[in-house]
Amino acid sequence: MLRRAIASLLCVLGLALAAGAAETPIGTFDRVTIAPTKTSIYIGTVALTMPTFVRKNGAYESSYAAKVFPYFFSNEKGALTITLTDESLRKLERGEPVEFSGRAVNTDGEERRIEGKATPEEGAHGLRGKIKVRVFVSKRIELIFNTSYRFGEL
């Protein structure tokens, strides 16, 4: 009887370890690329480009460039930080959407609040999907960008 109990316990333990090993290592989520995106504004557009984000201490960091057409004098560049916990990354890996927040600071020191939602593609284990980003330029101006993301070395 004791042998069966020990064998059952070892079997359950082995399955638990196998399930944990099936998870993608967090290191896979160290870099994320966001596709260039564009949104409409009154009589114009805003194009947003960002190089690959790198994860440091639970936050993704990158720079950004926003080009405003035809109002070129409103173009801006700056730094961008997005906070995403390990648990949120595990949710993405399981195929669950996650919300995130962050901030951007342009070269003039003006801060922009950022909120968004990442929705993974089915069967991609969170490594790619769609992303919706809201940039709060002022109390009354909010820019919404819809694009895609991809984790890993590219």
Regions found by a protein language model. Give the residues of each.
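Bacterial N-terminal signal peptides that target proteins for export
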Residues: 1-9
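N-terminal prepro-regions of secreted/extracellular proteins
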Residues: 5, 20-23
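Bacterial N-terminal signal peptides
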Residues: 8-16
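Central antiparallel beta-sheet cores of small beta-barrel/beta-sandwich binding domains
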Residues: 22-154
